[in-house]
Every structure is written in C-alpha cells, then in structure tokens.
UniProtKB/Swiss-Prot annotation:
InterPro entries: NAD(P)-bd_dom_sf, SDR_fam
One family name in Pfam for this protein: adh_short
SUPFAM superfamilies for this protein: NAD(P)-binding Rossmann-fold domains
Record protein name field: Uncharacterized oxidoreductase AN7799
Lineage start: Eukaryota, Fungi, Dikarya, Ascomycota, Pezizomycotina
Induction annotation: Up-regulated when grown with elevated levels of potassium chloride.
Listed EC numbers: 1.-.-.-
Record keywords, A-Z: NADP, Oxidoreductase, Stress response
Protein family per UniProt: Belongs to the short-chain dehydrogenases/reductases (SDR) family.
Enzyme class of the recorded protein, top EC level: oxidoreductase
Record: active site: 148 (proton donor), 152 (lowers pka of active site tyr)
UniProt GO BP: cellular response to osmotic stress
Amino acid sequence: MVRIFITGSSDGIGQAAAKVLSEQGHSVVLHARNADRAASAQEAVPGAEAVLVGDLSSIAETKALAEEANKLPPFDTVIHNAGIGYGATASQEITADKISAVFAVNTLAPYILTCLMHKPKARLLYMSSDSHYGGDESLRNITQSHSYGNTKLHDVMLANAFSRRWGNAIQVVSMHPGWVRTKMGGVMAPGALDRPARVLADWAIGKGDLARLKSGTFFTTSGPESAHPGADNVQKQEELLRICKEVSGVGVPGG
C-alpha cells in the first residue's frame, strides 16, 4: 500500500486519480479549499483516509495545511495538483496577502508545502501544463501577474530546483496532463479524465516506465517531453526560490 497526498482533489484530475488509487487499495489523503468541498470530496472518494482543508490562496492557510499534513503518517507520494487561472477558473483576484491569486495557488502554495511538509519518501510531482511553453522565465513582477502560463512554468522550475537540491533522494517531476474536460479545461476540451488520471495514479505508485523517470523530468500522458528551456536555468530557479521565500517567509530547508 502506498500513501499519497493530492492537493486540489475535490474535483477534476486530482479526484479522478484519487478514486483510481483508493480503489486499488492505496491510502489517499485528499485536499479541498473549504469544508463544503471537503464533504463532497469524501463522498466522491469514500475510501479516502482523510480530507484536509485549506485555501491555497492564503499564505496562512497553506502553512496550516502543511502542519495538518505533518500530523499524519509519512507520505510516499505528494502531488501538487491544485491550480486556478485557466478557462472557467481564470482569476484576476488580488488576495488578502496582496498577491495575485493565480501566483498564490499555482506557484507559492506548492513551494510552501514542499518546504514545510515532511519530504515524501519516494515521489513528488508538480502539476504543470503545456501552457508553460508560453511562460516568461524573466520572473518580472510575478507576484502581481495573473498569467497562468507563467505559473505553470514556475511549477516546472520548482520541480527542477528541488530535484537538483535533493539529488536522487526522491523522484521529483512535473507533468502536463493534457487538455481534458474538467472545470478548468472546460466542456470543449477534447480529452476525457480517464487517461491522465490513470497515468497520474500509475506514477504515484511507481508503476511501469514512469517509475524510472529521471528526477527533474517533465512528462505527459505519452511519456517524457522537453520542457521550456528556461526551466533549466539554475540562476532563475534560485531567483524564484528567493522570491517565494520573501513573499511567504518560508525558506527551503537546509538553505
């Protein structure tokens, strides 16, 4: 049995993967933005071990979520899946922390959780998108930007930064799940949830070829792909980590 924590698992790909994993007998901890969504997530995945609640647009709630996650037994796999800012979830909101909600949820929250949660035993994934190819690696004004593509590039950069820091200790990767029919993808999306959910579930338990992906790999449902070249820029990776630390007050463990 593998223990897995999936953010943004009250609907969409996160919930679909959680269902697959739970039905296979694995221990899955879900995450929802509020109590109402948590209740419906638990109903949708009745075999889930628990549902943790936290609004990832809030720095304080994200820190509290990390604390709650650390009270549970260690996870083998953590999936940073939560995201907003595309299609039906497009947002121009500035949060109470005076930053873009898109940046807060898509970039800052996975950074905070990675830094504050106990390191997973085996695998860590940042959910990206092919929209990251249009992202700007300059990192100009990123805390106020509402660009979805920029934040999805940040997710690949975060994966690469932590992969570089942690070496071969665990597998750290990023993924484009495809344009699928979810609340974010919209009803016009050509793909169904089944394939990305199963690929994500297979990766989460270290099944098949995905278990052998090199840490720092960006992959899709078809296998490894080349990411935006800016994602490999170590100087920019470190700059992104510095910005996230300055905004959140949370530093990377050990430096």
